Amino acid sequence: MPDYVAYRKSISNELIDLKDRVRNFIGRGHWGEDGRYKEIILKECLQNHLPANIKIGTGFIMGEGNRITKQIDIIIYTDSCPLLFQKGEFIIAPKEAVLGIIEVKTKLTINNLEETIAHSSENGQIVGRTIFNGIFSYEYGMGIHIERSEVLKSVLRRSSGLVNYICLGPDCFIKHWGYDTDHPNRNQYSTINEQI
């Protein structure tokens, strides 16, 4: 019988191993390049698991009324809809082509989590429809207590489900399931947290 949990953990371990390789070479002097490398690692991992007609880029999305998102680390789009601009992996995509967006962080702390969720929510509003809108952080720092963080709960409520997936390090995953049918103003989020 297949062991899907072990399979997913092996992918997680691969990402962890790859993320440290460049840091071990460059040391602490070039964290910006280290962050870009981590985006590349995640892009390649995603591309290896997506169908051939689904592409990955970085750049901007044009929404209704020619509104433009802030810069997006990873844009997942279909090649069946023409892009507005492309140079290498840099794209400007119409909202109709976009299937998902991901903000990539080396490390999230309670201090920058709210800003990151707000940034991703704003980009989701410009896209104007439900898409995969995720935040992927290789690590998360002190102050983020997943199950009891009032700050996290408050920020997620304000995002109104626009951010629907958050990965914090190798051990924590948060998913938005929609709205509570008995309380339409209440978002339903759940966490999978394997941290001991």
Show which residues each predicted segment covers.
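Intrinsically disordered, low-complexity Ser/Thr/Pro/Gly-rich regulatory segments
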Residues: M1-Q71, I76-I196
